[in-house]
Every structure is written in C-alpha cells, then in structure tokens.
C-alpha cells in the first residue's frame, strides 16, 4: 500500500486552506538567509560569547571558519599594481586546530592594543596568541590544554584588562569663526592594570565562576578563580555576562537561566602593586600575584518585554500580558560613555539588554504590533538610603553614623524594532553606539543620551563620523560582523563563511542636485577627528585611508590634510626648535597618510605631493639611526662592541643619505643652469618658477626636511670620527671600514654640504625677514611647502638667492662631474627611464637601504613560499624573512628572531618590529608557517 504522500495529496486538500486554522505554520520552506538568522539568534540566546569575527586596533582581522575548527587572519592592504586598497587573502592559523584538539571554536576577543587574541571553544578552553612581527604572523602564547574540558566552564563573558597608558584624545570639533577648532585632551587610563604591563584576561563561565588569566613577566600564564555569589542554585547557570572597567573597579552584569540580571563590582589587587624589572634581575622581587575582591550589589531586575510603562496612564497589567514569555535575551552589554576630560571621569554606565523573538516562534494570535527585538536599558545610579523619621527618636550609642549609598537600576524607555538586532557595538572610541539589524541596516546613537544620529543636526559641531552624516548603505546581510578601528568599515561573514567588506558613505554636500558646503565641511572635519583619535591612541588608520582614497577628490584630500596639521597642532616651522622634530609623535603619521594618498602603484612614480612627504619620511629614518647607534654603543663592553647587523644597517643608510644628498645637488646644478637665462629678469624668473616642479628644491626650502639633513650630517661626522677609537674585529671591522671609505669617496665632503645648508638657511631667513614674516607667520608658508608642494611667494626671493649665489659659489668645492655621473635611480624619486627600470626590476630594503635580489618574471623576488614557511622560529638560529608593508608596499628582509640583543633593541627603538618606516604594518611574504 503506497504512502499517502506519495500520491501527491496536498495537506490543504485534507484540512482546507493553509490559513484556515491559523496554526502559524510557515507556508513555504525557509530560505537560506532565514535559516542563518534563526541559527544566529539561537547562538546569541544560548551563550554570550559568540563573536566569530573581530577586527583589532592593530589592523588584523581574525575570523572563525564555517566548520568552527580554524581561525583565519587577514587585513587591509594596498595593491602593488595600482595602489588600490582591499582585503588581503586569508592566512589560516593552523596551530589553532591542534591547540583546541578539534573542539568547536565559538568566540574571538582582541586586547585593547590589538596585539593579543583570545580564542575560546565550546568547552570554555581559552588559547591566546600574539602578533610579534607581522599582521599575518600570529604565535600562540597560551595553550588551551591548560583548561579542563567541561561544559560548565563555557565562557559567557570575556574582557581584557586595560593597559596602563595615557593617550591623547579628541572630544569634538567645533566651528569657530569659520574654522574648525579641535578639542584635544589627555585621557588617563581607567581601571585595574597588570603591574608588569602584561596581558590579563577576565572570564565569566556558565557555572558562575570568574577567572583571571594573566601573564607573568617570564611569559608564562597563570590564573586565579572565584565564584560569583548567587541567591539560588538556578542563578548559577549563566547565559550572558557583560564586563566594563570603571574608576571604582570592574562592573559585571550577569544573566542567568532563570532570567535574572545581577550586578557585581569586582576589584583586583596585585601584590606587589608595582613591578620593577631591574629588581627582578637582582632576584629581589617576586612576580605580581592578583587576588579578587567581589561585591554582589544585590540588584535583581525583573522585566516586562516590552516595557509596560511606556505611555503614561496605561494599565501595566493589561498590556500584552503574554509577550514577555516570547522574548529571549540575545545580548547583554554595559555601556560606559566616552570621557571628555583628562581626569578620566565618565557619566554613569548603563546596562543594555537585547531581547528578541525567535524566527520560529508561534504567536498565540496575530499580533502585528509586536516588535521582533526590544532594547531594554537601565541607568546605573547611586542614591542614599533613607530611614523612616521614627528612627530619629531611637537613641544610638554610636552617634550619627554614615548611611552607605545604595546602587539602583532605573529602567529607561525601551527601543523597539520590527527587525532582529544581531549586534550592539560601542564604536568610534566610545562616542557612538551602533545597533545592527538582520536586514543589514545600522542605526547609530549617542551613548550618553541615546539620541539617534539621523544626519547632521548641528553642522557647526562634530563628535563622530555617524553624527556628521556618514552611514552604511544597505548591502547583503552578514550575520557576523565587526567594525574597523575607526568604525568606517565593516567586515562581515555571510551564511557561506565568506568575508565581505562594507564601506561608510557620505554625500559630501552633494544632495538632490544641490551642494551644501556645511555638510561637506562637517564630513572633512569628522574624518580628521577620526584620524586624529587614531593617532592619539596609536591605532591603525588604514580604514580611514581607504575612505580618503576611494571617496575624496584631490582638492578634498588637500583640505583633509590641512585640517590634520591644524588638529594635531603641527607647527611646520622648525627653523629654531629643531630638536623637537625628532620626537614629535604626530609628524610621521601626517607625512605617512599624505604620502599614501598619492601612491598609485609600486611601479609608477609618485606625484610631487606624495614624493615630498615620502622623501621626508626616509630622511627622518636616516636621521634617527645615527643617535640610536651612538646611544646603544655607549658602555658596551667586550672585544667587539659594535654589532655587525647594526653596522650593516648604518652602512646602507649612509649610502642612501649620501646619494640622496648628491641627487639634491645634481638637481640644483641643473636648475641653476636652466634659470641662468632669466637671471636678470625677475618677472620671467617668477613665471618660470611657477611651472617648475622640483622635489630637491622643496626639500631644501622646507625647514623640516632641512633639519633632518642637518641631523644626518651631524651623524655622518660622528660615525667618521668614532672609527679611530672603536675596537673592531671580524665583520664589524669590515662594515665600519666600508662606511668610512664611502664617506671619503663622496664627491662632496660633509662639512661642505653643511655649508650649503647654512647658505639655504640664510637665504630663507632673509626672505622671511624681507617680507615681514615673524615666527607667527612662518608656519603658513612652511605648511604650504609640505601639504601643497608649492613654493609660496614669500620664498621666491630665497630660490633666486640659492640659484644665483649659493650654488655658483660652491661649485669649486664639489666634484661636479662625479655628481652628474651618479646613478640615483635606486632612490626611487625620479620619473626617468633609469628610475622606471629599477622600480620594475629591483627592490630596495626600506629599512637597511640595501638592494634586494632581482625580480624573476612576475614574482616578487623575495624568496619562495617554502623558504618563508620555515620562518626560522622553529630553530634557535633564526631565519631570513621577507616582509612587505601593507601601506607603501616596500619590502624589508630581517632575521627573526634577531641574532643579537643590540640589533633587537635598535629595531624596537626605531619602531620597525611590526611596522614600516611609514607606519604601515608588515605582512609576511608567502604567508604563515603551518
């Protein structure tokens, strides 16, 4: 007998219309997106820690594979071929599968600086990884095998302890008399810190256990645990936990299986509270050991979903009495609005709980007005407990005692939506609360007032990108997503585990055929504010750079750069205060983004606006090497105090500095000859100068680059003078000897070049004085030289003096023929055939300034994948690695681990362990070892 369904009989033929019984059954098969949403909501309902993709402040994007067994990393990078920015290919962290022994990976969490990654699996086991040298080189520092395999240990809440460092921040930008004024302040760190400045991770487990994983100064990890106090056994089974650091300690909110929210305040005491590494070397100090002090604030929060008191006079007992049972908590957060002052004080935190109806939920009867998600908020407040007046009549032996303050939660108005909320994120350094929905739409709110950012309400005040009118266009939805460091990009995972990049957009004042200058200006100011916040917090700003390149015109980019120099208070006039130039924290950042804006590919010459900052960045690099070399060789004892690797670095940069100096002289000689025909006609001279584009001329006229040239000359003299007294042997003698021979063979002596710089100083000074420009007026033309790469009118007399008097007077002290015959193509600044050929056939190590092997075919010429995959960390001798900068696409080869302590210290001092001289992060060529 055949089965009844084999005859194709429809259910409706048996029971009538599909809607006649109002069973609430779906009329069609759920789509893949519906299934994905249902699965995502289930994940969020069951456990609070289910972040499968995370973007670190260093720029590394980590994501869990679709089968939950692997972690992949990727990042933003600039393409060598055309200078366009996009996501890199994935690099798998194969060691993760081994570390977690096949357990399903469920959660990712980066620390505040973005250098350490915590990976949690379904059994609550946690492994930790660090980024030592490159964005795609992630090494394990803590094994998950240390943790027990226990379902009750599953992580429901996780937070890295803050790092003890104060950073520069910016509160807002306000337009004053037609110009934007930025509000900088130094933000002090808040909360508990590891005394040894090591990593510390606080976790809350499903069984109500709080544990702190912390790293000792020797690199080993330890942990302490304590149980959260609960009112009943059912309260011990937690589903979600939220943690935030405040001035009074760590605030913890938990949600239990019996649907209660409890609040705790936790303090961590370290013994000793201070850590001095020098005392540890003497064996007189123990490692810091933490301990918990836990206070249960005894706040249990009942809730009605949605809130029954939204409308005044409404009977709470009659409004949707059944709806609370339909909702499940899907996320729990504690929001701490951003501080706007240097003291670190912040407004009171508030708790955010998102409740959603499952997609498969069956309603008792049609209720179209029931929202899919409800955002419930409680304000955390402190009030004094008051006693009944009768207690005043009771005599007390102890006199009037102080009444302890009481912590209360005041429920605020709910926020409802017909769409499901899939994430709540505090972005833009705490200045924006972003709520993401299942249809890919994102709503932005002010964390202090919960006012929605729907556009520009006040065009004269800018606090964030979202407030200034930036928004995300609707795109195919990703159910797992993470914001970039500046929150102007989103990376998301779709149902198939594929990664997608979403980019913020803005009209920039062009709307409906009209132009609004105020909206354009606010957009530029908000981008400036975001970039400056990244600079102050030492955060990766490649996401901002992508926006600038893709969306801004050249004029708008110039406007942005002018705002950056003003916001960061960069005084471009370094005629007198030259010593401040070497340690200025923001000059490299401003130069780097300016150079990157004009980069159109590795094999194309930069335009003049990009070449000027790119040359100054490299001058700064060379100028910093010599004082660092002198500093680290002081007091070194032994038969060979000079490190061969360091001397090789000094040798390469010495050759580069000399050739760049000769390149400037060669161009000056050519310009002097070219302008000789108009030397007697000032008007013709001025017109010819307007049509002349010369990198060497701008480098000489700018006080910033001229100061770097002077520092280099000082270093070259010190290197040459120190050779006679240096005890050298082996490779050190070979390299140091070659340095001195290179200096001796130069067509121009160092003292002669310093004489040229002094002549330029005099010409520039007289030009400023003749025009009546004092110290307050000079930054203007100096900034025009740097940002616009144009010679301002006030400096035209200086150019005339340099070409007519300074250069001709020094011809006799230089070997003009040797300068003319020099090969400067390897410097990379020219657009002649020789420079073009060198760019396509060779690479130059951007740090060591030494040529790298020729390219073969279309490859990079940087070694095979097999050679890179060896990495050398597996043996103690180190291995040669090729790293490429994700921003400028330049290459550097290095030994890792470094062969000597001095070499490592120099690399660390110069800031080149993880980043290039331009500030871009390294990408390991060939990928990561297995």
From Swiss-Prot:
Q: Name one Pfam family in it.
A: Med16_C
Enumerate the UniProt keywords alphabetically. Answer: Activator, Nucleus, Transcription, Transcription regulation
Q: Which residues cross the membrane?
A: none
Where does the secretion signal sit in this chain?
A: none
Q: Where in the cell is it found?
A: Nucleus
Cellular compartments per GO CC: mediator complex
Its predominant location is nucleus
GO-annotated biological processes: positive regulation of DNA-templated transcription
Family membership: Belongs to the Mediator complex subunit 16 family.
- Function description: Component of the Mediator complex, a coactivator involved in the regulated transcription of nearly all RNA polymerase II-dependent genes. Mediator functions as a bridge to convey information from gene-specific regulatory proteins to the basal RNA polymerase II transcription machinery. Mediator is recruited to promoters by direct interactions with regulatory proteins and serves as a scaffold for the assembly of a functional preinitiation complex with RNA polymerase II and the general transcription factors.
Subunit architecture: Component of the Mediator complex.
This protein is called what?
Mediator of RNA polymerase II transcription subunit 16
| Species per Swiss-Prot/TrEMBL record | Emericella nidulans (strain FGSC A4 / ATCC 38163 / CBS 112.46 / NRRL 194 / M139)
């Amino acid at each position: 007998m055949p089965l009844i369904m084999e005859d194709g009989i429809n259910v409706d033929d048996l029971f009538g219309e599909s809607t006649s019984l109002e069973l609430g059954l779906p009329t069609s098969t759920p789509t893949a997106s519906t299934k994905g949403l249902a699965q995502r909501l289930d994940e969020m309902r069951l456990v609070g820690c289910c972040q499968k993709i995370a973007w670190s402040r260093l720029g590394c994007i980590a994501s869990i594979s679709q089968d939950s067994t692997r972690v992949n990393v990727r990042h933003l990078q600039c393409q060598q071929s055309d200078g366009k920015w996009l996501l890199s290919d994935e690099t798998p962290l194969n060691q993760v599968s081994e570390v977690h022994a096949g357990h399903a990976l469920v959660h990712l969490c980066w620390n505040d600086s973005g250098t350490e990654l915590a990976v949690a699996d379904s059994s609550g086991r946690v492994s930790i990884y660090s980024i030592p040298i490159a964005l795609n080189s992630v090494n394990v520092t803590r094994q998950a095998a240390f943790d027990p395999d226990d379902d009750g240990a599953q992580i429901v809440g996780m937070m890295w302890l803050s790092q003890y460092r104060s950073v520069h921040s910016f509160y807002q930008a306000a337009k004053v008399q037609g110009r934007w004024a930025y509000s900088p302040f130094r933000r002090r760190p808040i909360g508990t810190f590891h005394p040894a400045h090591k990593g510390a991770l606080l976790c809350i487990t499903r069984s109500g256990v709080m544990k702190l994983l912390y790293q000792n100064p020797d690199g080993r990890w330890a942990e302490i645990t304590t149980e959260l106090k609960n009112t009943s056994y059912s309260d011990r089974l937690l589903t979600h936990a939220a943690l935030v650091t405040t001035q009074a300690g760590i605030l913890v909110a938990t949600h239990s299986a019996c649907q209660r929210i409890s609040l705790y305040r936790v303090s961590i005491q370290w013994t000793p509270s201070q850590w001095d590494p020098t005392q540890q070397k003497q064996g007189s100090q123990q490692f810091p050991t933490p301990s918990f002090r836990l206070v249960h604030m005894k706040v249990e929060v009942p809730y009605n979903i949605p809130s029954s008191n939204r409308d005044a006079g409404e009977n709470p007992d009659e409004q949707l009495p059944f709806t609370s049972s339909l909702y499940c908590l899907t996320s729990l957060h504690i929001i701490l609005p951003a501080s706007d002052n240097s003291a670190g004080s912040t407004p009171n935190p508030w708790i955010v709980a998102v409740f959603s109806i499952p997609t498969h939920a069956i309603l008792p009867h049609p209720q179209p007005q029931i929202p899919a998600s409800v955002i419930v908020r409680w304000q955390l407040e402190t009030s004094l407990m008051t006693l009944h007046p009768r207690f005043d009549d009771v005599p007390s032996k102890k006199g009037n005692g102080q009444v302890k303050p009481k912590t209360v939660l005041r429920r605020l108005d709910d926020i409802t939506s017909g769409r499901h909320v899939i994430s709540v994120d505090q972005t833009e350094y705490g200045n924006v609360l972003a709520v993401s929905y299942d249809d890919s739409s994102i709503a932005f709110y002010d964390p202090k007032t919960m006012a929605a950012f729907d556009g520009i309400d006040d065009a004269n005040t800018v606090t964030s990108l979202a407030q200034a009118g930036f928004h995300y266009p609707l795109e195919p939805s990703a159910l797992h997503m993470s914001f970039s460091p500046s929150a102007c990009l989103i990376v998301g995972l779709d149902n198939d585990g594929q990664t997608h990049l979403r980019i913020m957009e803005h009209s920039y004042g062009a709307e409906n055929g009209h132009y609004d200058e105020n909206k354009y200006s606010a957009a530029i100011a908000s981008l400036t504010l975001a970039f400056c916040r990244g600079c102050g917090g030492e955060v990766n700003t490649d996401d901002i750079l992508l926006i600038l390149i893709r969306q801004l015109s050249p004029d708008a980019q110039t406007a942005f750069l002018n705002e950056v120099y003003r916001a960061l208070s960069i005084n471009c006039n370094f005629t007198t205060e030259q010593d401040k130039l070497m340690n200025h924290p923001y000059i490299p950042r401003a130069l780097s983004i300016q150079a990157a804006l004009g980069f159109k590919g590795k094999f194309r010459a930069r335009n003049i606006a990009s070449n000027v900052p790119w040359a100054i960045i490299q001058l700064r690099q060379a100028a910093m090497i010599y004082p660092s070399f002198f500093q680290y060789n002081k007091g070194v004892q032994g038969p060979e105090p000079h490190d061969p690797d360091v001397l090789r670095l000094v040798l390469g940069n010495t050759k580069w500095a000399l050739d760049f100096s000769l390149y400037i002289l060669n161009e000056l000689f050519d310009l002097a000859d070219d302008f000789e025909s108009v030397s007697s006609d000032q008007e013709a001279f001025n017109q010819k100068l307007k049509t002349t584009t010369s990198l060497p001329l701008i480098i000489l006229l700018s006080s910033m680059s001229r100061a770097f040239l002077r520092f280099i000359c000082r270093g070259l003299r010190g290197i040459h003078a120190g050779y006679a007294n240096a005890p050298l042997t082996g490779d050190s003698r070979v390299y140091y000897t070659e340095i001195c021979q290179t200096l001796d063979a130069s067509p121009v002596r160092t003292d002669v070049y310093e004489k040229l710089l002094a002549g330029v100083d005099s010409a520039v000074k007289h030009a400023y004085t003749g025009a009546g420009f004092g110290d307050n007026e000079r930054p203007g033309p100096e900034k025009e030289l740097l940002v616009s790469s144009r010679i301002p009118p006030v400096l035209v007399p200086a150019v005339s003096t340099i070409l007519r008097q300074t250069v001709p007077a020094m011809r006799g002290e230089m070997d003009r023929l040797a300068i003319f015959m020099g090969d400067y193509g390897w410097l990379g600044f020219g657009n002649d055939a020789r420079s073009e050929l060198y760019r396509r056939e060779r690479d130059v190590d951007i740090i060591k300034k030494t040529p790298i092997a020729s390219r073969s075919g279309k490859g990079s010429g940087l070694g095979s994948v097999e050679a890179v995959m060896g990495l050398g960390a597996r043996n103690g001798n180190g291995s040669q690695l090729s790293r490429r900068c994700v921003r400028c696409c330049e290459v550097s080869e290095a030994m890792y681990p470094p062969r000597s302590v001095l070499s490592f210290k120099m690399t660390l001092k110069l800031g080149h362990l993880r980043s290039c001289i331009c500030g871009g992060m390294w990408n390991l060529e060939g990928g990561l070892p297995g």
